[in-house]
Amino acid sequence: MSKDTLFSAPIEKLGDFIFDESVAEVFPDMIQRSVPGYSNIITAIGMLASRFVTDQSNVYDLGCSRGAGILSIRRNVEKAGVRIIGVDNSEPMVERCRRHLEAYHSDIPVEILCDDIRHVEIKNASMVVLNFTLQFLPREDRLALLRKIYQGLNPNGVLVLSEKFTFEDNTINELLIDLHHTFKRANGYSELEVSQKRTALENVMRTDSIDTHKARLKEAGFSQVDLWFQCFNFGSMITIK
């Protein structure tokens, strides 16, 4: 696994964060060291798949990156006729995802698409995963995507939505941001790396509060919505149709 050193040296003209070749190469290391609880969420996605994925249905991972979520799902599904569709708009991510999945044998067919998740049809779905993806969409596009997911889910289908959160209480919000930065430093990132990456993400990742997510999911049609995992200002929600 390649180590993430992308922000270790001063960058004179720091642009917006993009999921390009350099990020795709180090992504597994980057996300493990940057997102508290990421491994737990990936493991639990597999557990949820074993409960919710049904025979002759589709599973979607929207923003699949290098395929960690898909692998977890595939290892835990024993139903007949299941098809997994992974979507990511980064060609370098898609290329690595395909190679990664090919390294592990499975009888469950997987299709990896390089596309905008807003343009992908959701149909006959027993499970949809949005793992730290929605926060990169323009806010005005989020409800429409969630409505499309709701309409494409079968009854009793599940949506797993993992996100970085903001908190309405400013004291709590600043505390959790600081704890997250402490977590990153404990994982070997320098103060410069933490600062430069935060700046690069400012214009591309727009986070919402848990209450905002819940209200939006309910507006999209979901009635059963709750938080099942949280570590600092990162967490995951489960919604059932």
From Swiss-Prot:
EC number: 2.1.3.-
Keyword Iron tagged: no
BP-aspect Gene Ontology terms: tRNA wobble uridine modification
SUPFAM superfamilies associated with the record: S-adenosyl-L-methionine-dependent methyltransferases
Name of a matching Pfam family: Methyltransf_25
Origin superkingdom: Bacteria
First-tier enzyme category under EC: transferase
UniProt binding sites for S-adenosyl-L-methionine: 38, 63-65, 88-89, 116-117, 131, 198
Catalysed reactions listed for this entry: prephenate + S-adenosyl-L-methionine = carboxy-S-adenosyl-L-methionine + 3-phenylpyruvate + H2O
Keywords: S-adenosyl-L-methionine, Transferase
CDD domains: AdoMet_MTases
Bilayer-spanning residue ranges: none
Presence of the UniProt keyword S-adenosyl-L-methionine in the record: yes
Gene Ontology molecular function, alphabetical: carboxyl- or carbamoyltransferase activity; S-adenosyl-L-methionine binding
Function (record text): Catalyzes the conversion of S-adenosyl-L-methionine (SAM) to carboxy-S-adenosyl-L-methionine (Cx-SAM).
Subunit structure comment from the entry: Homodimer.
The family this protein is said to belong to: Belongs to the class I-like SAM-binding methyltransferase superfamily. Cx-SAM synthase family.
Name this protein carries in UniProt: Carboxy-S-adenosyl-L-methionine synthase
Protein source organism: Glaesserella parasuis serovar 5 (strain SH0165)
Source lineage: Bacteria, Pseudomonadati, Pseudomonadota, Gammaproteobacteria, Pasteurellales
